[in-house]
Regions:
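Glycine-rich, aromatic-lined ligand/substrate-binding cores of catalytic
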Residues: 34-177
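A contiguous active-site-proximal alpha/beta segment in oxidoreductase catalytic domains
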Residues: 1-45
């Protein structure tokens, strides 16, 4: 409503963030632990086309989000909800360019690990969009997860929270006004 009413002007920068993941992410695939498949769960159906593995409580019912074979990490889990706001508001389409940086995992001291099957513990993704029919200038959108927060704007008092304090999610559109 603020954008459509012209109150924030043309938007050139958008920040979207979440405190997720709140599940294990950036860790190796769990080993089978002999857990029993819960009654009523068809484990083979749940796995779908993903690699067949033995059931373990490490995946189900919630933590599956942290491995690429079963989930999409914090971006796929929360991004679809939060990024929808600027997409609809600004009339965004496909980005012209995307750049990503992810957090490093250290399983042992001073020993970085590469765990390709696990989603990263944190990420920062920058998407560059062309001007749209609704917003006449190019837009840079930044997705932040894993505890990474956007810079605090000068116009907002330093002690004011950005976003919903209970969930640490937020969307901030920086306009010309």
């Amino acid at each position: 409503e603020w954008f459509d009413a012209g109150l924030i002007g043309e938007v050139d920068e958008v920040f979207v963030w979440t405190n997720r993941p709140v599940w294990p992410q950036g860790i190796p695939v769990p080993k089978s632990d002999g857990s029993q498949v819960p009654e009523g769960l068809d484990w083979d159906l749940w796995l779908g086309p993903a690699p067949k593995i033995d059931y373990t409580n490490a995946y189900h019912p919630f933590n599956w989000r942290g491995w690429w074979a079963y989930g999409t990490g914090a971006l796929g889990d929360m991004g679809c909800h939060l990024i929808d706001v600027p997409f609809r508001t600004l009339g965004l389409h496909y980005p012209k360019a995307v750049e990503c940086s992810v957090g490093q995992v250290f399983i042992k001291m001073w020993s970085p690990e590469y765990i390709p099957e696990g989603c990263p513990p944190s990420s920062s993704v920058t998407l560059d969009f062309a001007a749209t029919d609704k917003n006449k200038i190019p837009i840079k959108m930044r997705w932040l997860d894993g505890g990474i927060r956007p810079p605090h704007p000068d116009l907002i008092p330093a002690n004011d929270s950005l976003g919903d304090e209970s969930s640490s999610n937020g969307v901030m559109m920086i306009g010309s006004k």
